[in-house]
Every structure is written in C-alpha cells, then in structure tokens.
Amino acid sequence: MKRQSDPKKGALTGPSQRQLRAGELIRHALVEILREEELQDEALQNISVTVSEVRMSPDLKHAICFVEPLGAGLTGQDTTDIIKGLNRVSKFLRGRLGRSIDMKFTPDLKFIHDESFGTAAYMDKLFLDPRVQQDTRRLSDVVDDEDEA
C-alpha cells in the first residue's frame, strides 16, 4: 500500500487514524464471518484462517486483508490455494461484511498471505543457533563493560 505524504513536512506518514479504526473494525467482523460461515469453495473446507491485519485505502473503499492459514502439514501450495479460494469468495464475504458493519461503503476485499509469521519463525530459529547466541553473549558483555566505565 502506498504511503501518504504530508505536504507540510515533505515526509512520509502512515495510515490515518480513520483508516486504522476501519481496518480493525473490518478485521474483527471478518474473523467472526470466517468462524461462523460455511464457505462453499473447495479449498476452504475445514480450514481455519487467522486475519492478522487489514489495511484500508485512504477512501476506505478497498481493503487488503493479511491472512495466515492455520493447521499442521499445510504446504506452500495449500496456502496459495487457500488465498486464491478466499479471493474467489471475496464478493460473498463482502456481502456478509456489509450486513455486520456500519460503514458508508463496504470495501472490496483482497486477501494476501501474511509472511510475518514465517519471518518470525525464521528469526526464532536463527536466535537459537549456537553461533548467534555466542555473538549475543559477547555483545552483552561489551555493553556491560561500557556501563561500568
């Protein structure tokens, strides 16, 4: 999502408070809809999905939903199929969403796989590496020595 620039400061700013509030409202509503509804897409049968973030466009007419399929044994292809399935039923989800939230416009939904869970798992694995732990111990010893001086 493109960040908005502030003409006064010339710097990039993040999403507005309104976008953040609308995104959280939609995220909560989507979680409930996905939990309660029996979606007809074959890729979504007996699948649990977590919605980690919803980013809204400045006009609140488009929403990018970051999701992570849950379950042991899911392959990358399974995840891709689930994301494609969610995008196929996005019009249905938009209709249900329109009935459960109070907004002037119900946004178009686009689902994207949330890579942050994989990144966090990789970082955890990396920090457990003995060589990295050895380096972090050395760094903390140097910082402790500087604090004493």
Curated annotation (Swiss-Prot):
It is found in: Cytoplasm. Its main location: cytoplasm. GO terms for molecular function: ribosomal small subunit binding. One of its GO terms (cellular component) is cytosol. The keyword Cytoplasm applies. Keywords: Cytoplasm, Ribosome biogenesis. GO terms for biological process: maturation of SSU-rRNA. HAMAP family: RbfA (MF_00003). PANTHER family: RIBOSOME-BINDING FACTOR A, CHLOROPLASTIC-RELATED (PTHR33515:SF1). One of several proteins that assist in the late maturation steps of the functional core of the 30S ribosomal subunit. Associates with free 30S ribosomal subunits (but not with 30S subunits that are part of 70S ribosomes or polysomes). Required for efficient processing of 16S rRNA. May interact with the 5'-terminal helix region of 16S rRNA. Belongs to the RbfA family. This is Ribosome-binding factor A. It comes from Caulobacter vibrioides (strain NA1000 / CB15N) (Caulobacter crescentus).
